[in-house]
């Protein structure tokens, strides 16, 4: 079976909710990332066999957002494209799917990744088609309904984090300490330029000229444990999950060029990392945040590795509670986890997050000369996904 490698890995900066990227459609963010990924891989647009992009909040975005992004990026019309929705795992699943397609011999070069603009999610008028007879009407927030709401238990994702905090006995203090560490690491990473090689600037044209967005907006520099402790529970009256120890609502695109090793050699491309294995798992939706535990175990078993062998770990921080539960039970060395901060600080643009953490992992492995890496996320509805990489 073919060996699969990552030829390039790029992302846009992560925009805060309603801030700099709020008027940039997800497909435009995706197109920007695709262009840069192709350029950095050193390949021609016509070398690409397929485009697979994750996107969750698709209402009002138009047919097949991945195809739109491909067109806007200037790829040839003959290249097919597919949009994947595996909620928070979408962007990572596109990469494992690309690897599977390449291993099967059906393609040699695939653009994979994810894109999301949560700021642009519309409100839905579900009964408008056949007319409101009289009285008040209700608008439904598509961002909440399609992205952040447990369809099985009829409650917010935040409650699933509360469930984990209770079941695993994870205190408010532990969650806040974890969140603070994420903020501090992200602040240091941004100030020291750790993300410069992975971020492609987004240029926004306006009446007053151009605005360039090239720095993550979500981190709160100067965060303190005292400040986090003052925040009230966000989802449950006596709960422990707050806006400070949960991830944000964000806008971003992240894209990777995935290739067979033989094609990379043929084209003279120097790969960044090899995709070793991937895992996927389902769990009780009420504790969806625990999904990475099983997905990681599956990927580790396939690779024949142990957790101790991992040099770097990108474990998406949907909530501090679920991140801690997974880390404790998998016995992660916390010095290896999210070394440049995670989603609590950087943000969680749901359809893009899987690709975003993988892009960040690839670059961190290069900078730190780390041999083995893991990227994993929990998924709303009760799932987990994971990918293992080896530096080339």
Curated annotation (Swiss-Prot):
InterPro entries: Thiolase, Thiolase-like, Thiolase_acyl_enz_int_AS, Thiolase_AS, Thiolase_C, Thiolase_CS, Thiolase_N. One of its GO terms (molecular function) is acetyl-CoA C-acetyltransferase activity. Disulfide bonds join 88-378. Regulated by a redox-switch modulation. Reversibly inactivated by oxidative stress through the disulfide bond formation between two catalytic residues, Cys-88 and Cys-378, which enables the enzyme to protect its active site from oxygen radicals and be reactivated upon switching back to a reducing condition. It is found in: Cytoplasm. Acetate binds at residues 96, 279-280, 386. Changing residue 153 to Y: 3-fold increase in thiolase activity, prevents disulfide bond formation under oxidized condition and results in the loss of regulatory mechanism based on redox-switch modulation. Its EC number is 2.3.1.9. Keywords: Acyltransferase, Cytoplasm, Disulfide bond, Transferase. The keyword Transferase applies. The active site is at 88 (acyl-thioester intermediate), 348 (proton acceptor), 378 (proton acceptor). Gene3D superfamilies: 3.40.47.10. Catalyzes the condensation of two molecules of acetyl-CoA to produce acetoacetyl-CoA. Involved in solvent production. Homotetramer. Belongs to the thiolase-like superfamily. Thiolase family. This is Acetyl-CoA acetyltransferase. It comes from Clostridium acetobutylicum (strain ATCC 824 / DSM 792 / JCM 1419 / IAM 19013 / LMG 5710 / NBRC 13948 / NRRL B-527 / VKM B-1787 / 2291 / W).
């Amino acid at each position: 079976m073919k060996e699969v490698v990552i030829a390039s890995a790029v992302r846009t900066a992560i925009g805060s909710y309603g801030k700099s990227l709020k008027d940039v459609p997800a497909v435009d963010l995706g197109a920007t990332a695709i262009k840069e990924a192709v350029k950095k891989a050193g390949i021609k647009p016509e070398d690409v066999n397929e485009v697979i992009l994750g996107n969750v909040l698709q209402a009002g975005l138009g047919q097949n957002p991945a195809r739109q992004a491909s067109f806007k990026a200037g790829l040839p019309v003959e290249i097919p494209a597919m949009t994947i929705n595996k909620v928070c795992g979408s962007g990572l699943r596109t990469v494992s799917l690309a690897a599977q397609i390449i291993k099967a011999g059906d393609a040699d070069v695939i653009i994979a990744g994810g894109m999301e603009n949560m700021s642009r999610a519309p409100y839905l008028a579900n009964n408008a088609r056949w007319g409101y007879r009289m009285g008040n009407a209700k608008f439904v927030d598509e961002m909440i309904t399609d992205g952040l709401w447990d369809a099985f238990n009829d409650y917010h994702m935040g409650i699933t984090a509360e469930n984990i905090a209770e079941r695993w006995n994870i205190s408010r203090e532990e969650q806040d300490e974890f969140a603070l560490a994420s903020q501090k690491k992200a602040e240091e990473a941004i100030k020291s330029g750790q993300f410069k090689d992975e971020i492609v600037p987004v240029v926004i044209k306006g009446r007053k000229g151009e605005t360039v967005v090239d720095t993550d907006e979500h981190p709160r520099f100067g965060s303190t444990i005292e400040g986090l402790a003052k925040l009230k529970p966000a989802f449950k009256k006596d709960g422990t999950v707050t806006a400070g120890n949960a991830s944000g609502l964000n806008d971003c695109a992240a894209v990777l060029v995935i290739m067979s090793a033989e094609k990379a050699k043929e084209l003279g491309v120097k790969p960044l990392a090899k995709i070793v294995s991937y895992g996927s798992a389902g769990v009780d939706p009420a504790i969806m945040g625990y999904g990475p535990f099983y997905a990681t175990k599956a990927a580790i078993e396939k690779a024949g590795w142990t957790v101790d062998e991992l040099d770097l770990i990108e474990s998406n921080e949907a909530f501090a509670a679920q991140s801690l539960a997974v880390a404790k039970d998998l016995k992660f060395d916390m010095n290896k986890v999210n070394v440049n901060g995670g989603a609590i600080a950087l943000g969680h643009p749901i359809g893009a997050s899987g690709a975003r953490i993988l892009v960040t992992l690839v670059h961190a492995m290069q900078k730190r000369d780390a041999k083995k890496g893991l990227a994993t996320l929990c998924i709303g509805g009760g799932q987990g996904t994971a990918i293992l990489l080896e530096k080339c």
